[in-house]
Amino acid sequence: MKFFTVLLFASLAATSLAAVPGSKDELHLRTQPTDAIPASQFTPSSHISKESTSSKDLSKESFIFNEELVSEDNVGTESTKPQSQEAQDGLRSGSSQQEETTSAATSEGKLTMLSQAVQKELGKVIEGFISGVEDIISGASGTVRP
């Protein structure tokens, strides 16, 4: 029982740390809009009304969907941080590179501190849950079933 409890809390900790709430330098994925794909490609091969179908017919019925897959080449990343014209042209001076390095280090430091704070709080919560479960289990071991 303790093993499953610890396993549950470990998975909770892993998922909560994976979803640390936003920073200013978030990355967003950009994909092709779904409006570019014709609706005819998503139309099932046959149409049957609800009244004329039974559960047997549904198991035999096959639907064919044609989908256009988006390749990884069409997916790009886009920073929400605005870029100057110099950065877009690839002409960066030493001072602008220093500023970008400093801002990246600052946001990494903030992210690290936030992650450590979340880990500490989560550790406290897990310890509380484990002690509560241990109390329940130890209290239940003294009871006798009729």
UniProtKB/Swiss-Prot annotation:
Extensively O-glycosylated. Its main location: membrane. Lymph nodes. Associated with the lumenal surface of the high endothelial venules of peripheral lymph nodes. It is found in: Cell membrane. One of its GO terms (biological process) is cell adhesion. InterPro entries: GLYCAM-1 (IPR007906). Belongs to the PP3/GlyCAM-1 family. This is Glycosylation-dependent cell adhesion molecule 1. It comes from Rattus norvegicus. The gene is Glycam1.
